[in-house]
């Protein structure tokens, strides 16, 4: 009898056990649009709800908008036609969730990529008539758990949100899939994302970005599924948005502004750096071969080499001035580069850059994430930690720091010299056999600190960075101590790097630190998420191929190839003699070349790290060579 009454009560439960979720889409808006003071509905949502910026990714042709919608619906970074397209809708359908699609959703609209086959679809076309659209929304909720509405201008969005906040009692999300497009069809902005319904006011982040105020477009599908109490499929690479901290609007506006400035400044800065570096390096080489290193031409050539060494550090420091215009941003970068080039040598500049990177890594990589060289937020290649760009600069600078020193008090030193020759310096970091333990411990600590910042989970673990740094520094340690180095030592140091990666993964799991890439991969394998592993692997392979074939990469490789040919033809004896006079520089130079090889082999897009590491080493070699030979006679 009791069992019968229990069954009747169970059957009497309401059909809508899960919350009713409302998603509002509005394209081509920015943070400034949804924070206008004349939009009270959106202002209320910001005050009472959650907010973040969303990375739509770079505009990918032929249809950038469609690709973003496909990503929103897949929970993974995909393009139109990918097998993952519409995965969220498939999951919802299997879970018994009924879906409705309203508003500007007619034929040819990208909303079909988000919800390919909704249970209810109403192309009202009334994107500027919020009251009528809200009536259609209420009607859809009588039979559906999820309603997606696509609206038009910001004013219409605000009117609709004002009504929804008052009358809708479930989760509500405002998603801006794409920012305003530029004339060439690309974009340079992040988009706003707002949430309401949880009753608290906070910043948002996600496990994808692990960055306050930032989520990725592939996080939208997992966020919607979580709101509907539906488990995300194992193949989704995105993660649900989650609250992180109290709201500080200045953080959002600064991230939005720097993202735009970095996108606008990248082309002029990188073309200027590339063309300027080629002109300076090959021009100074011509002056050297012509015997014009004495006097003003030689000083200008050496200053130019130091300027080329300084630009990565200048890009780290320029955003600290909080520029608001791209012209001011570029001027700050140029001024900082010119000032840093006043330092006496490329090794010192590179060592200082490495020190700044280590300090930034220990404090959250704010400088790196805002640098135009990395510019994580919009591209979405990497959202946190140290990427290949500054990994190469860090390893190169850490090596060159071992060739620096303080002048030994000898009477024959020329006090007017701008740089004491390296052979007359007492090393600041490092040791050779018989020099005592203090220098050796200093060298070990310096190398360990660089490896720690590159690999520790809480700083944004980079498995390839740990392997590259470990291999490079072990080789450097042995060479600095005048111990032999062969392929067995290289293989052993690479193995030690992988051991370190596994140790960090175990420690991260035990202490609940930021998840490492290895931990994520092992977890995916344990859950049978082979599609996730395959998808990430294919995406990294594709990214590596695109980076390797990028015109900038090819031009950089061509420049280094030409420089190698010129050095082999005209400078080889002078280089050998220079390295023999400076054994510490010779030791780190050789270790750096090994490190470039390891970077290419064990990092996705490792060619970038290798190029920047090689830049540090080559400029330091040329500067030292030209400085020593400034009074040499002209060469035939």
Language model regions located:
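Long, compositionally biased intrinsically disordered regions
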Residues: 450, 487-636
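Core alpha-helical transmembrane segments of integral membrane proteins
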Residues: 254-377, 392-398, 407-409
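Alpha-helical transmembrane segments at the extracellular/periplasmic loop-to-helix junctions
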Residues: 272-279, 382-405, 532, 543-569
